[in-house]
C-alpha cells in the first residue's frame, strides 16, 4: 500500500507582523534589524574570555587555586545565557489594532470630542486611568491605532509599542521591556562581576609573572593579557555604572523612559503610583514577579484569506490510498496516476435505437 501525502505551505503570523523586527528559527527568535552592535558585544565577551581561559586561567589554576577557572566559567555562562535571552525574546510588543478595532476606536474618539471646526487643532487623544488613587494618562498611538497601556511607549527603532518600555538597547539588539527587563538586569549585573573578575586576575597574573621574569619581560611575553586589561578597564566603568543606575531604578520601580521624561521626579513632584514604598517589594515585583506570556502568537497559523495564498485544489488536498502491488506501482506512469485520482466524467446519454430497416424486394 502506498500513501501520497501532500504538504501545504503554512503561513505563520510572524511573517505578516508589522514593525521593523527580524525573526529567525520559524519565529522563535525575535530581534531588531540593527544587529551590528550586538555582534560587537558577542565578540568582546567571547574574545576576552577565550584569551583569559587559554592563558591566565591555566597558570593561575596551578599557582593559586583550580577554583579560579571554575568561577570564571560560571560567570561567563550565566552572562551569555542572560544576554541571549534578552536579545532573542519578545520584550512585550503590543499587537496593533485590526481594521475593525481601529474604526471602532475612531468612532469613540469622534463621539467623545465632537465635531472639530475647520482650521482648529483637534484635542489630544488621551484617556484618564486611575492607579492607586492617582490619575494616569493613556496616550493614543497613531501608528498602532491603540490607546497604549500604562507605562507603554512606541519604539521608533523597532516601530512597535512595548509594554513597560524601558529603552532600546543596541548592545543587546532588542528593546528592553516588561518581558525581558529582568534578564537584561541580570546580564549587566553578571557582566559587571565577570569584568571585575577577569580584570583583577589579569593584574594578579602580571604581578606573579613579574616576580620571576620582570615586568617589561612579562608584557612582552603576554600581549594577550595587555589587550584583556585594556578592554576590561574601559568596559568596567560603563558596565558597572549602568548596573548601579538600573539598581537605583529597580529599587524605585521606575523605568529609564520615565526617569528621562521626569514623570515622577519633575517639577510637579507627582508620586510614583507603581512604587510600593519599599525597596524589597519593588525589587521582588520587577525581578521576581510572574512573567507575562507573549501576546503576539508569532507561530500561530494565518487563515488562507489573510495569508494571501491560493486555496488548494482537490488533487492537492486528497491523498491516494489505493492498494497496489509492487509491480503495478513500478510500471504506472504519471498519466495513469492522474486517471486514477481524477473525478470520473459523466456518461453521455444513450443514443436512440435505429428504426427497423425496410423489407427486402424479395419479400415484397
From Swiss-Prot:
Q: Which Pfam family, just one, is annotated for this protein?
A: DHHC
Q: Which residues cross the membrane?
A: 36-56, 64-84, 184-204, 229-249
Q: Recorded E.C. number(s)?
A: 2.3.1.225
Active-site residues, as the UniProt record annotates them: 169 (s-palmitoyl cysteine intermediate)
Region of interest (Disordered), ranges: 303-364
* Ranges facing Cytoplasmic side: 1-35, 85-183, 250-364
For this protein, the record's InterPro entries field holds: Palmitoyltrfase_DHHC, PFA4/ZDH16/20/ERF2-like
* Annotated DHHC domain residues: 139-189
Recorded catalytic reaction(s): these are:
L-cysteinyl-[protein] + hexadecanoyl-CoA = S-hexadecanoyl-L-cysteinyl-[protein] + CoA
- Location in or out of the cell: Endoplasmic reticulum membrane; Golgi apparatus membrane
- Top EC class of this enzyme: transferase
Enumerate composition-biased segments (Pro residues): 346-356
GO cellular-component term (any): endoplasmic reticulum membrane
The protein's superkingdom reads Eukaryota
Q: Which family does it belong to?
A: Belongs to the DHHC palmitoyltransferase family. ERF2/ZDHHC9 subfamily.
The written remark on domains in the entry is: The DHHC domain is required for palmitoyltransferase activity.
Subunit text: Interacts with GOLGA7.
Role this protein plays = Palmitoyltransferase that catalyzes the addition of palmitate onto various protein substrates, such as ADRB2, GSDMD, HRAS, NRAS and CGAS. The ZDHHC9-GOLGA7 complex is a palmitoyltransferase specific for HRAS and NRAS. May have a palmitoyltransferase activity toward the beta-2 adrenergic receptor/ADRB2 and therefore regulate G protein-coupled receptor signaling. Acts as a regulator of innate immunity by catalyzing palmitoylation of CGAS, thereby promoting CGAS homodimerization and cyclic GMP-AMP synthase activity.
Q: Please report the name of this protein according to its UniProt entry.
A: Palmitoyltransferase ZDHHC9
**Organism encoding this protein:** Mus musculus (Mouse)
Amino acid at each position: 500500500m502506498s500513501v501520497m501525502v501532500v504538504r501545504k505551505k503554512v503561513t505563520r503570523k510572524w511573517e505578516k507582523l508589522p514593525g521593523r523586527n527580524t525573526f529567525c528559527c520559524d519565529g522563535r527568535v525575535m530581534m531588531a534589524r540593527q544587529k551590528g552592535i550586538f555582534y560587537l558585544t558577542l565578540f568582546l565577551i567571547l574574545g576576552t574570555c577565550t584569551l583569559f581561559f587559554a592563558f591566565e586561567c591555566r597558570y593561575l589554576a596551578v599557582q593559586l587555586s583550580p577554583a579560579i577557572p571554575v568561577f570564571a566559567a560560571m560567570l561567563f555562562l550565566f552572562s551569555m545565557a542572560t544576554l541571549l535571552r534578552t536579545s532573542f525574546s519578545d520584550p512585550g510588543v503590543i499587537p496593533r489594532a485590526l481594521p475593525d478595532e481601529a474604526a471602532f476606536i475612531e468612532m469613540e474618539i469622534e463621539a467623545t470630542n465632537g465635531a472639530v471646526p475647520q482650521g482648529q487643532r483637534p484635542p489630544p487623544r488621551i484617556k484618564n486611568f486611575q492607579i492607586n488613587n492617582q490619575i494616569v494618562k493613556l496616550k493614543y498611538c497613531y501608528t498602532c491605532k491603540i490607546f497604549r497601556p500604562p507605562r507603554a511607549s512606541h519604539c521608533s527603532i523597532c516601530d512597535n509599542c512595548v509594554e513597560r518600555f524601558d529603552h532600546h538597547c543596541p548592545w543587546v539588539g532588542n528593546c528592553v521591556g516588561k518581558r525581558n527587563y529582568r534578564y537584561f538586569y541580570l546580564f549587566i549585573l553578571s557582566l559587571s562581576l565577570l569584568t571585575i573578575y577577569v580584570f583583577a586576575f589579569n593584574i594578579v597574573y602580571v604581578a606573579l609573572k613579574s616576580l620571576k621574569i620582570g615586568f617589561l619581560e612579562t608584557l612582552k611575553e603576554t600581549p594577550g593579557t595587555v589587550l584583556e586589561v585594556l578592554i576590561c578597564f574601559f568596559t568596567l566603568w560603563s558596565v558597572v555604572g549602568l548596573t548601579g543606575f538600573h539598581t537605583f531604578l529597580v529599587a524605585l520601580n521606575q523605568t529609564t523612559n520615565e526617569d528621562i521624561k521626569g514623570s515622577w521626579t519633575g517639577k510637579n513632584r507627582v508620586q510614583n503610583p507603581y512604587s510600593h514604598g519599599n525597596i524589597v517589594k519593588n525589587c521582588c515585583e520587577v525581578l521576581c514577579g510572574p512573567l507575562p506570556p507573549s501576546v503576539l502568537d508569532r507561530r500561530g497559523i494565518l487563515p488562507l484569506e489573510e495569508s494571501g495564498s491560493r486555496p488548494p485544489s482537490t488533487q492537492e488536498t486528497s491523498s491516494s490510498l489505493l492498494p497496489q502491488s509492487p509491480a503495478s506501482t513500478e510500471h504506472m506512469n504519471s498519466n495513469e496516476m492522474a486517471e486514477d485520482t481524477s473525478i470520473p466524467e459523466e456518461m453521455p446519454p444513450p443514443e436512440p435505437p435505429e428504426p427497423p430497416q425496410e423489407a427486402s424486394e424479395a419479400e415484397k
